[in-house]
Amino acid sequence: YPFVKCTLSSSSCECPAPETFLLQDPNYFGFRDPWPFLTSPDRLYLKYGPLKLLENIQCIISGLIKYDRSSGDVERNVSWTNIGEQPSRESINVDLEGTKKSKSEVTATTTRFGSHDFNTVYSDPRCLVLRISQTEKKVPFRSCLLWVKEPFLKNPLRHCRFLFDVFCNWNRVDLKPAKDCDKGVEKKDERPTRAGNQNSGTNRPPR
């Protein structure tokens, strides 16, 4: 194989990590286009994610808000359940954009959390594996997200899990998503409290 390096003076050979070989293989590029998945009207459920980022969170779901075919703009909603004595539901809107550098790269922007970059390591009509950019210093190396479409939640998707193991950090959490796991969970009350209203007036500039 051309990617295996051996020398006559040594009885050993050097093999690159499988992920490195696959990501550079032109035959694999066709499996790294995330946009058919991200523009799908199906609800998407997060199955795997970095343990560090998903503490006390479950049932992460993304729904399509808008897909403009002419401009390529994609907007989705992402909601999740905060685990506690009284579970509550939060949500944010996310703008998704591609980059000129590569079709596999995705930038996600929110007003609450700013912008974050991802690189697609695998995508098909059933699942999507996104690796969080290595420029994100707060997440472990090779951290990934595995998203699954709602119709395939009960499918083992062994190939998706296998590729996640090949490309991604094994220190992950399995959210074990179930269809409609968001039903019956109250939305987080974001209304300001009476104390908050009183405090907010103390910093007003004089008129």
List PLM regions with ranges.
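A beta-rich soluble binding module of mature secreted/lumenal proteins
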Residues: Y1-R207
